[in-house]
Structure formats: C-alpha cells, structure tokens
Amino acid sequence: MSILRSSRLLQILLGIIGVVFTVLLVTPGLVVEYFWLSELDYSSVFWTIRGAQVLLFVLVFLVAGLYFGGNFRVLIGNIPPLWASRWAQEGEAPEVGGEPLTRDRLQRLGYVVAGVLSLLFAAGFSGRWNDLLRFWYAGSYGQADPVYGVDLAFYMLELPFLQSLQSAVVGLAFLGLLALVTGYVIAGQIGIQDGGFEADSGALRHLGANLIFLLLGWAWGFYLDLYELLQEGGGAVYGAGYTDVNVVIPALYVMVAATLVLAGLVGLNLYRRRLRLLGIGGAGYLVLLVGGLVLAPSLVTQLTVLPSELQVERPYLENNIDMTREAYALGDFKERSYPAQPDLPADAVEQNEETIDNVRLWDPRLLIDTYRQLQEIRLYYEFYSVDVDRYMLDGDYRQVMVSPRELTQQLPEDTWDNRHVRFTHGYGSVSNLVAREGSEGSPEFLTQDIPPQSKYESLDVDNPALYYGERTPTYRIVPAGVPGDSLELDYPRSGENKYTRYGGEGGVSVGSFWKQLLFSYYMGDFNILLTDYIQDDSQIQFWNQVEERVRHVAPFLKLDKDPYLVHGDDRHYYIADAYTTSNSFPYSEPIRGQQGYQGTRYIRNSVKVVVDAYNGDVSLYVSNPEDPIIQTYQRIFPDLFQPLDAMPELLQNHIRYPQDFFEIQMERYRRYHQTQPQVFYNNEDLWTRPQEQYANQQRKMEPYYILTDLPGKDDAGLEFMLMLPMTPDGRDNMIGWVAARSDPPNYGEVVVYELPKDRLIRGPNQIESRIDQDTEISQQLSLWDQRGSSVIRGNLIVVPIEESFLYVEPIYLIADEIQIPEMQRVIAATDQDVAMKRTLRQSLNSVLGEQVVETRDQALAQMQQAAQTAQAASPEQVEGLERAKELIQEARDALQGGDFATFGDRFDELQQVLNDVPLPDTTGTVPPPTSSDTTGTMTAPTGDVSEVTGGS
C-alpha cells in the first residue's frame, strides 16, 4: 500500500510539474504579446485571436477527450479479468511498478493516454483560428461558381475550415480505431486462434461503432471533394473538365450514398450477424470506388476527351480563363493599342523634357554599394535597400531614390549596453535624383550626411531618428538612465558626438520589477533584471522591424517584401503593402514558384500599412474595400482598419502599385490574356518577361517604376507607374507593355498596350544585342574591362515616348581596389540607332542627330532637283523658292546648334511652302509634294545642298 501511495504522489507531483512547465512555457509569451498590442491600442486583436484559439482548443479537447476516454472505458470494460485472460502467466496477473495491473489502474492509464492524445489534437487544431474566424464571419462574393452555382465566398472563406474539420474527424476516428484494434489484440479479444479468426462479440460491436464514425467522416469527405474538384489541376483545364463534370462528380455523389449505405450495413451487424451481406456490401463499395473514380474517368478521357480535346473542353477552358482572370483581378486591365513608331521625332527631347529628366539611370542593385561607401559615415550604420519614389521638388514632379540609414546588425563594440541602451536608432536617409549624377560618376544627392542636409524643403524631416525599420536589430531600452541623462547616441559629429534621450511613446513600460522579471525571462537576458539603466519611465522596444510589427498586428495578411521609407514633415514613415489571399478559388490556376505565395489561388492588395519610424505606431488602411476577404476581416476586427481616405494626404501621395502583386498578376496575364479558348489551348499568343543583360549575365527583366506621361489619357502630365515590357514566349521582340498607375485618382488602374503584330518592334534583349554589335561601344567596354576595372551594364529601361520607344542603359565602372560603382556612360537607343556618350542628353542628341542627318539627306536630294528647275519657274514659284532658301538657312542654324525642335518646325513650314507653290520638273510636270510621316521625320524638295550643309 505504501508503494501504491508513493506512486500516486509521484503522479501528482509529475502532473504539477507539467502544469507549471506549460504555464512557464506559454504564459510569458502571451502576456508579452498582450502588453505589446495594448501599447499600440490593438488589445482587441489579442482577445479575438487568442479567444478563437482557446475556444477551438477547449472544444476539440473536450470532443477528443470524450471520444478517446469513452472508447478506452469501453475497451477496459470488454477485457475480462486480467488474471483469467491470455496475458496471465501461470495464473498470475502482470505487474507494473511492483503492483498488480488491475482494471482500475488500467482505466486510469487509459484516461492518461486519452488526455495526451486529446491535448495533441487540440493543440494542432487551435492553429486553425484564422479558418474558424473567416468561416464564422463569412460574407458574400456576389458571384457564383460555374458548375454548382455556389457563391465564391464559400470556397474562399468556408470550405477551408470545413475541410480541416473533416480531416480532424477522420483522423480522430482512424486513430481511435487503430488504438482499439491494438488494445483488443493485446488483450486477446481479437486474433488468430487454431488457424481461424476469433473475436469477442463485445469487441466487434465496439469496433463496428467506431467504423461507422469513420465511414461517416469519409462520406463527408466525398461530399467536400465535389467542391475541391473545381480546384484541381490536370489535363487541358485547371479545374473541373469534361470528365470531372460528367463522370467524377456523379461518381462522388454515388460514393457519398454508398459510404452511408456501408455504414448502415455495419450498424446492422452490430445487432444481427449479417457477415455475408456486409462482405457483399464491402466488395461492392470497392468496385464503385475503383470503377467510378479510377477506371471510368480514365476510359472517358482516353475515348472521348483526348480525340477531340479542344471541342469537348471548350466550355471548361472558358471557366478556367474567366475564373483565373477574376482571381487575380486581370479582368480589370484596360487594353489599348500602341503604334510603336520605328523612329523618335527630332523634337522628342524638347517635347518630353520632364520624362527625360526622370529616366532612371541609377540601378538600385549598384546604388546601394555607392551609398554604403559614401554615406554610412560610421561603422554602426548600414544601408540595406534602395527604394524608388516620387516627390514634389520646388514644384517639379521628380522621381527619387531613397534609402534609410539604419543601425547595423553587428556593432563594432558589441557590448550589452551598446546594443540595448546606447545605440538605439538609425538616423535619417540618403536620396538622389534617378537621372542625375554628381562629380566623378557618383549620384547627385538630394539628402545626405549626418545630420541630414536636404536640398529641398519637401525632403526636410524635423526628427530623422529611425527607431523602427526594415532591419532594426534586437530589443532596446529607452529612455535609459536617470531623468536628464542622455545616453543614446543620436548622431556622430566632429569633436563630440550628439546624444539624446528618447521622448516618444513607442515601447512597453518596463519600470516595475515584475515586468523586468517577465522580460528577462522572455528575452532570455537577465541583464534586464540586473541593470541600473532601467528607471520608472523606461520602455522596452522589441519587434522593431516593419515586417515583425505587421505580422503581430495582422498575422492573417501577407506582406510585400519591399516596405519603403517616406519623408514626412516631422518624421519618417514606412509604407508596406499587404495582401489578402486564399488557397481556395474554383478554376483558378494557383501560384507556383513564388516564395511566400505558393498555392495561392486568389490575391488582392487590400491593405496599405503605415509604420511610424519614431513611435512604432502601426496603421492599416483599406485600399480595396470591395474585396470580400477584407470585408470579412473588418467584421472580425472592427477596430483594426481605417478607410484609405483617413490616411494623411502627404502619405497618400506616396502609395504605389506594389511590385510583388504586379509580378504575380503578370505571371498569370502572360497566358490568361488569351481569352479565346482555342488560342489559350494552343498557347498561340503566350507572352513572357523579356531577358536583359546585367553584370554579364542574362536574366529576367524586373518591373520598374517610371515617371512619364501615359499615352492616350485625357489629361497631360507626368504620373508615377510600374512598368514591364513583354515579349512573345521564346522570342525577343517586344509584343506589348504594361503600366500599373500609382497616382490618385487613377491608383490601381492597369493598362496593357499591345503593339502591332505585322512588323518587328525590338525588345530589350535585341537592343542589348545591338549594343554588343556596335564596334565603337564594344571596343570601349572591352578596354575598360582590361584596365583593372569591372564594367557593369545596368538595368535597361524602356521608355514609351512620342508613340515610340527610347531604350536607356547606364554603364558603370567598379575599380578592383574600391568597390564604388561609378556611372561612366549612358547608352541611348531607338529602334534604328544606338549611341553611348557621357550623359543621357548627349546620347540622345547623337541618336536623334543621326536620324535628322538621314532625314536631311533624303530632303536635300529633292532640294537639288528643285534647284535645277528654277529657271522655268513662274514669279510665284520664284518667291516660294526664296522663302524656301530662308527656311533652309534657319533649319541649318538650328541643326548646328542642336535645336531639333526648331529644325523640325522649319521643315514643317518648308513643306507647307512647297505644297502651296509646287515646282515644275524638267519634263514640265509638277511632282507631288512629299509629306511628313507620323514620326516627325521630314522630307521635302529644297534648294542647293550646300545651303544646309554649309559646304561640308
């Protein structure tokens, strides 16, 4: 008895230790999370999410506990006394711990096992809190699937939870059945005896009841498979095709009924032995399963579908096209034609000054190295990324590149107080115009140095301290030290560094002993408890990276990989794009190969997140209120979201179309722009992203932000957009280009410009080839490469301009000794010409000048012919020739001065003069005038060639 009592005490002690361990493991994290969310005024998020988890945990634990506990109780009850069972050895019951294994002890053991299994089930299923909330608060999409007529919101918001619940039911039943079979076999109630199968009737009834439970779960699974079938890939159609709709769907309905019938037969055998009937039912069930879901679909596919696949699959291809376009918002794209003239007009530069001034020459992949070398200033600062944005600079709309100066991940002197008390924040940012360079090929900085010096008032920030950022390291304690102490390094300066004391509201109060103890345990750093730096007003700042903050505030959103810094009036802000997604959407082709979005079938950029870089405040603004998923989350978290109009206007001016979302859309659009089933089936017009050459390697061109005047719109003026040229799959010529608009009121509009298909329009890779084939350019690049420097060709930018294209590629040199990229040349190209000069303007003048010379030569040949006929001219024709000579002289002066706009104007006027006074040819007939083409390339008959060329 003393041994038994000691065993019970040990069990109680182990139970207490387990509870304490669980509390210590789980509770600190929950308390810390609650404090953190409360500091941001989002405590309701904590209670909603954790409440849903607790509810799921408790419900699943109770259901699983009742199921396992009840089954184990029946199992033990069906086992005869152990000393009389087949376990007994020489009439003695087995012992455990020196005590007989009685029925009561076995019952308690069964309850322990049931409790452990229930805990595992409950812990796993509680992670489905998001599915539960979406299911509970689901609304309507307003559009039905094309097969069952069920609202699409069912697939996106309800089906995932139902599938999880069905899987849990089947898993519970299967595990319970497996445990019962094992228990009965060990107890000798089921087994092979004397060459035959023997089973206790009570054991069979118990197992039969659990088998019914399993079959009911299977029947439910077959029913849910009806909806899952609309999302499965295979064959020509992604989703349910001809075979699925006409064979598999009826077979699934049959399997639902057959499974229920089989469950009924098992139930009948609980009370009346009808093993023969049960055997026939089981065999028939297998025949239906294999025949209906394997053999019949295969035969129909081989005999009916494959011989005329396009014909029979046409309506389902249409479903696939329509639903995928809906899932990725491709149906909202506006499609227009773009003439893509082969030549730029002579006055292209003068007519598009603002666009030319905003062509991005600085490649972010190289500019980051320049920033690091020239502007990190101290070893404890680092630049991690460069973002492209736009600002109004003294009334001019300019494209700007910006990078925050953040704390490095590894301090030079990595002591505890340096890491957590003294080096607490980054400082300011660096920015430059995208198309300007300063001395020696470096950027022309708009904001630079420490403290930041800005050339424009719109870039000035009163408080440039960055306590929160993209890569902000570890936690820190602010303010530290006694009131009045300034322990934090604000920024370095000559002589003596500038120190400061944090005066913001970011962070969780850590002044009390209990909170210091809590955070010491949670952070695994007991210096928090021991340090003298912490005072009553001290706060601990943690989860300081933008991605971390958004993930803890809204873990149900996917975050874009590129948050970007914005200059505010008083401080810096980060803007991040967040997405609502679903892995369930009928007939939608899922995302493959894009990290973080694998398996996604529906996506919307529904949220813009703003993070205060000084206080750490997180604000979420709904940018797509029509999205049914964000509508659901607004019902779940009524205090979390704000309308986009509530965002400060200064920040609204900096929202942009996100690159991740655009790339996902373009990966789908490259195929799903083919809306005709036959074209889609044959991939007759498949597009792809073009290749470009970067750092001597071929790679896929990335979308890029550009500031230009979008063709075909009603109002003229620059606007900020994300652009990507497209080429036919397997070819390098350009077939179209896509622009995603970012400026209000047109934010979110995507325009696709399709190019003529009856002639060649050079794509980026073909322009790269033309550059390689240019002897002068190739020789110069090779020469630089041989002089101890590396030549890197930056990203090629395609600029739509004057119904044509301008191609621009910067050339950088990187010395082997000092890794500072310097922009040495800029290549400009059109469809016809290419030039490399020191600046973009010089390259443009060279390219356009070659076109003008060609135009001039054509015109001068006709001028020479006209001069030869002057003797036979009438007085009116003589007067016209005199005026023509004056215009020729003015055109020559303009050409020599590089004034192509005036040159074009004079040729236009010359054309008009010659049209009004036609000149006789040498045979006495009047030749028809030659008109200017739509590119602005002028040809007209004129006088003496030397009048224009100056005799050269």
UniProtKB/Swiss-Prot annotation:
Q: Which domain of life is it from?
A: Bacteria
Residues spanning the membrane:
12-32, 52-72, 109-129, 168-188, 207-227, 247-267, 277-297
- UniProt membrane topology term: Multi-pass membrane protein
**Which regions are flagged for Polar residues bias?**
931-940
**InterPro entries from the entry?**
UPF0182
Q: Where is this region: Disordered?
A: 917-952
Pfam families in the cross-refs: UPF0182
What keywords is this UniProt entry annotated with? Cell membrane, Membrane, Transmembrane, Transmembrane helix
Where found? Cell membrane
Q: Name one GO cellular component term.
A: extracellular region
Q: What is its main location?
A: membrane
The record's similarity note reads: Belongs to the UPF0182 family.
Q: What is this protein called?
A: UPF0182 protein SRU_2225
Q: Which organism is it from?
A: Salinibacter ruber (strain DSM 13855 / M31)
